[in-house]
Curated annotation (Swiss-Prot):
This is Zinc finger protein-like 1. It is a single-pass membrane protein. The chain crosses the membrane at residues 267-287. Interacts with GOLGA2/GM130. The lineage of its organism: Eukaryota, Metazoa, Chordata, Craniata, Vertebrata.
Length: 310
C-alpha cells in the first residue's frame, strides 16, 4: 500500500513501473494512460516490464491504447481486431484478456475511473455493445495511420550521394537570376500559425524516444524541513531513535493551547507534591548520616555499657 502524490492523496496499491510512483485510478486514467501499471507487490517481485503491446509487439506509446479492469494495457486497434474475429454469438464471458484470460467486459457492479473509461471505449463498437446490453450502431471504420518506419528512408542517402551536382551545373545555377534561388512563399494568415516540415535525407539514424517526465503533482514550494520521496531515501536504514526525533519535532512545531484554571491548579498541586517528597527524602538521608556519625549514639563510647567478659 502507498499514498498517491496527487491532490486527492488516496491510499492505493497500484504502482507505475515506468515512473516508479504509487498512482490511484484517477491519476491512472488522466496521466498514466500508456504506462504499465500493476500492484506494488508485483513490482517488488519483478520490476522488469515490457513497453510493447503484447498483440503486435509495437510500443504502446505509438498508438491509442485501452486498459482493461485487470490493468493490462493493449492497443485499441489490436484488441478490437482480435475480438471482432470471434463469432457473433460469442457470450460476454468468451471475450477474455489475451494476457491473463480475465474478462474484457467490466462487471456491472464495478465502479471506478478505469471501468468507466473502458465502458465508454467499448460502447463505440458493435461486438462490445452487444455484450454490454446496448443497441447496435452503424460503425464508421476510420483507418488508423501507420507509424513511420525508418526503412522507408534508408534509400534516400544513396540518392542524395549519387545526385551530387557537377561543376557545370554549379556554374549554370550561379548564373541564374537571384529571384530563382528561393521559391516564392505564400503569405501566412494572421490567425493560423505557419507550419514547417524538415526532412533529413542523409545519414539516417534509428528513431529513439526520450523518457517521459515523471508525473508529480506536488507543489514546488515545499516546506524547507520536508524532503522529497526519492528512491535512494526510501529504502535506506532509519536511525533507531528517529521516531522520537520526529515526535519531538512535531510537538515543538505545533501551537500549544492555553491551560485552563483547573489544569493550572492540578499542575501546581503535582509540582508541590513532588517537591514535598523530594524534601522528605533529602531530610531523611541527612538525618541518617548525622545519626551514624554521632558519638553519643555509639554503644562502645558509652561508659555505662560494657561489652565483653565481665
Amino acid at each position: 500500500m502507498g499514498l498517491c502524490k496527487c491532490p486527492k492523496r488516496k491510499v492505493t496499491n497500484l504502482f507505475c513501473f515506468e515512473h516508479r510512483v504509487n498512482v490511484c485510478e484517477h491519476c491512472l486514467v488522466a496521466n498514466h494512460a500508456k504506462c504499465i501499471v500493476q500492484s506494488y507487490l508485483q513490482w517488488l517481485q519483478d520490476s522488469d516490464y515490457n513497453p510493447n503491446c503484447r498483440l503486435c509487439n509495437i510500443p504502446l506509446a505509438s498508438r491509442e491504447t485501452t486498459r482493461l479492469v485487470c490493468y493490462d494495457l493493449f492497443h485499441w486497434a489490436c484488441l478490437n481486431e482480435r475480438a471482432a474475429q470471434l463469432p457473433r454469438n460469442t457470450a460476454p464471458a468468451g471475450y477474455q484478456c489475451p494476457s491473463c484470460n480475465g474478462p474484457i467486459f467490466p462487471p456491472t457492479n464495478l465502479a471506478g475511473p478505469v471501468a468507466s473509461a473502458l465502458r465508454e471505449k467499448l460502447a463505440t463498437v458493435n461486438w462490445a455493445r452487444a455484450g454490454l446490453g446496448l443497441p447496435l450502431i452503424d460503425e464508421v471504420v476510420s483507418p488508423e495511420p501507420e507509424p513511420l518506419n525508418t526503412s522507408d528512408f534508408s534509400d534516400w542517402s544513396s540518392f542524395n550521394a549519387s545526385s551530387t551536382p557537377g561543376p557545370e551545373e554549379v556554374d549554370s545555377a550561379s548564373a541564374a537570376p537571384a529571384f530563382y534561388s528561393q521559391a516564392p512563399r505564400p503569405p501566412a494568415s494572421p490567425g493560423r500559425p505557419e507550419q514547417h516540415t524538415v526532412i533529413h535525407m542523409g545519414n539516417p539514424e534509428p528513431l529513439t524516444h526520450a523518457p517521459r517526465k515523471v508525473y508529480d503533482t506536488r507543489d514546488d514550494d515545499r516546506t524547507p524541513g520536508l524532503h522529497g520521496d526519492c528512491d535512494d531515501d526510501k529504502y535506506r536504514r532509519r536511525p533507531a531513535l528517529g521516531w522520537l526525533a520526529r515526535l519531538l519535532r512535531s510537538r515543538a512545531g505545533s501551537r500549544k493551547r492555553p491551560l485552563t484554571l483547573l489544569q493550572r491548579a492540578g499542575l501546581l498541586l503535582l509540582l508541590g507534591l513532588l517537591g514535598f517528597l523530594a524534601l522528605l527524602a533529602l531530610m531523611s538521608r541527612l538525618g541518617r548520616a548525622a545519626a551514624d556519625s554521632d558519638p553519643n549514639l555509639d554503644p562502645l563510647m558509652n561508659p555505662h555499657i560494657r561489652v565483653g567478659p565481665s
